Curated annotation (Swiss-Prot):
Propeptide: 16-23
UniProt domain Peptidase S1: residue ranges: 24-244
Keywords from the named record: Calcium, Digestion, Disease variant, Disulfide bond, Hydrolase, Metal-binding, Protease, Secreted, Serine protease, Signal, Sulfation, Zymogen
Residue pairs linked by disulfide bridges in the UniProt entry: C30-C160, C48-C64, C139-C206, C171-C185, C196-C220
SUPFAM superfamilies listed in its UniProt record: Trypsin-like serine proteases
Name of the protein: Serine protease 1
PROSITE patterns: TRYPSIN_DOM, TRYPSIN_HIS, TRYPSIN_SER
Disease as annotated in the protein's UniProt record: Pancreatitis, hereditary: A disease characterized by pancreas inflammation, permanent destruction of the pancreatic parenchyma, maldigestion, and severe abdominal pain attacks.
Result of altering D22G: In PCTT; increased rate of activation
PTM comment text: Occurs in a single-chain form and a two-chain form, produced by proteolytic cleavage after Arg-122. Sulfation at Tyr-154 increases selectivity towards basic versus apolar residues at the P2' position of inhibitors that bind in a substrate-like fashion. Although the increase in selectivity is relatively small, it may facilitate digestion of a broader range of dietary proteins.
Region forming the signal peptide: 1-15
Length: 247
């Protein structure tokens, strides 16, 4: 089980057999400024995604932890200075105390910004969930990630994918013995579209609420192997308590 260190969104060509030479592409270029809560975590290079939940706090994945992180907000094309980005260093990086790097249970992390983000057309917050994600709900997954099944082909512009929440039973059947109550699956059991090696820590937003954090998966766009995400609803109390204790 490998964490998705660079999330992308993939769709295998259904009319052709899958092989390592196929370039799996999927999703679409997000409309600029349409995902204003999406952030890029940078340590000299983009390595993970995250979500702005208030002016000074970001949610990401526990396995994205680094001792020094610069949070980049208002990004669309990460290779171009577009003029409205905000680059803010992390003041505190707090991984969940029960994070398990082997099972990726409790794969969630909070980042406190050293200064408050300026909310504008390019940068805004996303709400925490008020209920767990319902089966069948369509969600938006976003990030900058590898669009090649073999080798590396990283998009400069933010990518988006629309995908449904799968039932917990189907999720557990896809990964026997590996799915905890803190995880859920989003995607397509028939394969063809998936998150794949890229932008862990990035958002899964359903009905305007941050329901998931990109966590892990087995391969890309494989049949019966959907993407696995941290269930943010289970951590709302921890998030609120941690923010209050570190204000």
């Amino acid at each position: 089980m490998n964490p998705l260190l660079i999330l992308t969104f993939v769709a295998a060509a259904l009319a052709a057999p899958f092989d390592d030479d196929d370039k799996i592409v999927g999703g679409y270029n997000c409309e600029e400024n349409s995902v204003p809560y999406q952030v890029s975590l940078n340590s000299g290079y983009h390595f993970c995604g995250g979500s702005l939940i208030n002016e000074q706090w970001v949610v990401s994945a526990g396995h994205c932890y680094k001792s020094r992180i610069q949070v980049r907000l208002g990004e669309h094309n990460i290779e171009v200075l577009e003029g409205n980005e905000q680059f803010i260093n992390a003041a505190k990086i707090i991984r969940h105390p029960q994070y398990d790097r082997k099972t990726l249970n409790n794969d969630i992390m909070l980042i406190k910004l050293s200064s408050r983000a300026v909310i504008n057309a390019r940068v805004s917050t996303i709400s925490l969930p008020t209920a767990p994600p319902a089966t069948g709900t369509k969600c938006l997954i976003s990030g900058w990630g590898n669009t090649a099944s073999s080798g590396a082909d990283y998009p400069d512009e933010l990518q988006c994918l629309d995908a449904p929440v799968l039932s917990q039973a189907k999720c557990e059947a896809s990964y026997p013995g590996k799915i905890t109550s803190n995880m859920f699956c989003v995607g397509f059991l028939e394969g063809g579209k998936d998150s794949c090696q890229g932008d862990s820590g990035g958002p899964v937003v359903c009905n305007g609420q941050l329901q998931g954090v990109v966590s892990w998966g087995d391969g890309c766009a494989q049949k019966n192997k959907p993407g696995v995400y941290t269930k943010v609803y289970n951590y709302v109390k921890w998030i609120k308590n941690t923010i209050a204790a570190n204000s």
